[in-house]
């Protein structure tokens, strides 16, 4: 017998690729009558740098990580709007200054999540191929079920590449 989900945790970076992930997490939370926890990982960034980079054009230095707290706030606000419109009960929106996988894993444990919903964005950089992408790390280390949402267009997730120092 399958157990019901009581707390669904979803990661967002505010990108268009995150919309189907948040939408699916909200749908599951609504169907399961579960709480929804929205998590956004961010890296240190100045207010000036945040202001110069539109959320839709962000190419974070780490896949899935938003550059700065202000951009992360916009990302979780957008995700919450999507979730509420879908009928989900949002228990918390979290801004976590950490690696995206670690942010999801620790937030899920802290909020007693029994399902993590994450998007499948692949990091094509050398480091990404050696270390694995965020979804791979979460799937390997999660204490609960993990649902990986594929992009609607299969090529979309391949086009994400972190900035280089060049």
Show which residues each predicted segment covers.
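Structural beta-alpha unit
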Residues: 1-4, 78-116, 153-166
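Small/aliphatic-rich secondary-structure junction motif
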Residues: 2-61, 88-93, 165-166
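Short, solvent-exposed amphipathic alpha-helices that sit
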Residues: 24, 70-79, 103
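Short secondary-structure boundary segments
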Residues: 40, 119-121, 150-151
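A short acidic, glycine-rich active-site loop
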Residues: 58-74
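Glycine-rich, Arg-bearing micro-motifs that act as flexible, cationic patches
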Residues: 115-137, 155-159
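Short, flexible loop segments at boundaries between secondary-structure elements
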Residues: 144-156
């Amino acid at each position: 017998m399958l157990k019901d989900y009581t707390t669904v945790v979803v990661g967002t970076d505010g990108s268009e690729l995150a919309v189907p992930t948040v939408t699916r997490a909200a749908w599951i939370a609504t169907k399961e009558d579960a709480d929804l926890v929205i998590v956004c990982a961010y890296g240190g960034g100045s207010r000036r740098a945040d202001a110069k980079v539109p959320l839709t054009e962000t190419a974070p230095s780490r896949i899935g990580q938003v550059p700065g707290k202000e951009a992360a706030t916009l990302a979780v606000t957008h995700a919450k709007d999507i979730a509420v419109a879908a009928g989900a009960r949002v228990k918390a929106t979290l801004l976590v200054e950490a690696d995206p996988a670690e942010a999801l894993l620790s937030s899920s444990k802290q909020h007693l999540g029994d399902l993590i919903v994450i998007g499948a964005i692949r990091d094509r950089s050398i480091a990404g191929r050696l270390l694995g992408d965020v979804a791979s790390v979460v799937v390997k280390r999660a204490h609960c079920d993990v649902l990986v949402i594929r992009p609607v267009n299969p090529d979309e997730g391949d086009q994400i590449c972190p900035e280089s120092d060049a």
